[in-house]
Amino acid sequence: MKLENKNTIGFVGAPWTLLVYMINQQSPKKNVKKNFFDDEYLINRILLIIEKFLKIHIKNQVENGANVIQIFDSWAGLLEERDYPNFIYTPTLNLVNYVKSLNIPVICFPRDIKNYKEFCEIVKPDAVNIDYNVDPLTIQKNIKIPVQGGLDPKILLTDQENLKKETLKYLDIFKDHPYIFNLGHGILPETKPEMVEYLIKTIKDY
């Protein structure tokens, strides 16, 4: 489906995050089966298989109208920095290069990663989505590519005054930087629709 004058963003989970869900069989917020992850050889083999099928999924989305692809690594923060090269950088870079080979821009979201600057330098996405635990000023100073996101979804559970304050903070910090306003993670189920409407109005009125 192609929409005139609109970008259609396709998305996939990053290989590491999909592996976590496959092995854990649930959200790993409370329970992570860590013993499995000691077998580095097995992990790398599975990541390659996941990567193969993700490329098929990406191609299908592009052929059906997606003109941007976003890669979500929701559980990047589970890893120690020493594990980033094998489990995050290499598999994600392979996907980024594949998306670019289709002449499609790619956004990456390595949630809770400890070094966004290093990630961007190695993986080379066209834009990066940041989470709400990172300092936006540090990102603005250190990241040269377009930035997306950052606002804590819990802010939408407060009041309009607080929501406007936090929203304007991000808009002010990134006013001279290519920036796509978004949340620093998914919207929470209990969020009131009128708060989302107020957020959108605040952004449009800026």
Indicate where each model-derived feature is located.
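Active-site loop segments of alpha/beta catalytic cores
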Residues: M1-Y206
